Amino acid sequence: MLSTYPPTECGIATFAQSLTKSLEHNGANLNIFRLMNGDQSQSPKQVICEHFGKRDCDQTVEGLNQHDLAIIQHEFGIFDGRDGDEVVSILENIEVPVITVLHTVLSNPTVNQRDIINEIARHSKALVTMTQSGKAKLVANYKVDATKVHVVPHGARPVNQNAKPTSLLPEKTRPRVLTWGLIGPGKGIEWAIAAMHQLKGSEIFPEYVVAGQTHPQVKLRQGESYRNELKRVIHEFGLDEDIHLIDKYLNENELDELIASADLVVLPYDSQEQVTSGVLVEALMAGKPIVATNFPHAREVLFDKSGILVNQKDPHGIAEGIRTIIGSKHRANAMKARMNRKTSSLLWTSIGQRYLEIAHSIKGEKVSDSRQHVAS
């Protein structure tokens, strides 16, 4: 598999690690070709090649070609070159079948971005997107054969519902609203803070927890300007005792403890393009009521009222969503019941099996034929 990979701290790295474990659980042999993306941290043993940029393309391609099949995780920002166009140079020279997982599908790409996706599609045996809306965009806006596109949901691990109380926060004395993940512009945290300001003084006034480090690429370019602006707004609104910013990349145990302590999850993202959210799927798996802005992945997952959708940049809508869930135990329990009907199909073990089925279909084999030797 060619992807960013832990200890790199980003969503795609975490996704790649989870998918790798799931594929291995289902019988595949995997090697990791790690996109370093400016990260100098030491790679785990499973990484057999570190790719720092275009200078490494020949070495990476040579290694990938020694496998039965390659899986490539794609996001414009993780490859070298203009809009990450080095991925095209890699794909042009891969001789084994390729499955490319598209983590972003833009409705209005630049000419260069559209060309890159079209080239990815041309050189891949299969494309994976995680939502039906992603597939629809690919078919409508790009030169992509619909039969080549597979919709496989973002996987999630089981969340420990009985985790001990978190040590990252003071003792809980009122309802807790949670947002987690890497932080940066576009996450919409400022709108959730404004929603908390609207709730202050009302009968329903929870505490709000924002957990996660600043995204490494954001920190590289902008430092902590976004986080500092959030702190300024929190202080201006007089919410210093009501909003907690946890500047930490959480391990699974810490995250489980935090999720278990929450009464609901808020995803206030600005983007109207986001077709994938690992946090959304994890919240769903944990059975936590969700208030989310109206981005594509949320629309698809929460269509059956297993959460509340609000407009982007709408503090009033977020506040009303929080008020509705905390104020109605019946409504919250109904959301949890709807979520529970979806979760088994989202477990990583099930998702890994779906990827193996795609792998065998493009190689013309049945799933039980052999153990795949996959470059991931």
Residue ranges and their predicted role:
Residues 222-249:
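Nucleotide-activated donor-binding/catalytic signature segment of Leloir-type glycosyltransferases, i.e.
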Residues 169-187, 193-196, 208-211:
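Conserved donor-binding/catalytic core segment of Leloir-type glycosyltransferases
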Residues 13-14, 184-198, 203, 316:
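A conserved mid-protein helix/loop that constitutes part of the nucleotide-sugar donor-binding site
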Residues 304, 308-315, 324-329:
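Conserved acidic donor-binding segment of nucleotide-sugar-dependent glycosyltransferases
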Residues 265, 285, 289-292:
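Short hydrophobic beta-strand element within catalytic cores of glycosyltransferases
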Residues 122-161:
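Donor nucleotide-sugar binding/catalytic pocket of nucleotide-sugar-dependent glycosyltransferases
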Residues 10, 330-360:
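A charged, aromatic-enriched C-terminal amphipathic alpha-helix characteristic of glycosyltransferases
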Residues 121, 256-262:
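Short alpha-helical donor nucleotide-sugar binding micro-motif in glycosyltransferases
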